């Protein structure tokens, strides 16, 4: 898989020129003439531009058997809906919105994607580092915009989510549980009916092993029952 719209040379440039250059550059770096999927990556406030020249290029490359599937990775569910409505999307990637802290796409993107047989990628199940195991903290020294862009709302850089994340971590820590186990297994139980995957985003082998361990550790039913009683969340 590769993506368009994210290279520093053409960041969030969804023109025909930028899209074509990005694809050619990715294929060159990957030393391939075919990829299974390409995602339109990260439009922030405008969904129409990516669905014009950029999508046209991807559809053309797909027709020429250069790529297998077309997708979009973006935060807003209304952007997912608009993309799915084109009839050209095979995949939608969402992030931060099916976690222990937020399940908003369970009522928006997931039902629509299932109805239209569009694959779902659920990203950031650990909400950055907030649900990764260590005590949740936000870097108060990091300068943030007064109005967070959509991609950062509810993220590890959003002070609004820290209190609940810390309460969940403390609840687990008091019981010798790892919050990461619950976070990963909750995401894996998302109601995608076999038509989706969870993208954890490990940056090294150690993190990969930690995620695998959390996915396969046994979490007793009574733990989920108690967690639901405390936070209203369960599998």
Predicted regions and their residues:
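Active-site mouth loops of central-metabolism enzymes
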Residues: 2-20, 47
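A short, mixed-charge helix-start or loop-turn motif at secondary-structure junctions
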Residues: 5-8, 40, 149-151
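Generic anion/oxyanion-binding catalytic loop in active/binding sites
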Residues: 8, 15, 24, 171, ...
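Short, acidic/polar
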Residues: 14-30, 75-82
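Active-site groove signature of glycoside hydrolases
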Residues: 27-46
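Beta/alpha (TIM)-barrel catalytic core signal, keyed to glycine-rich beta->alpha loops juxtaposed to Asp/Glu
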Residues: 43-235
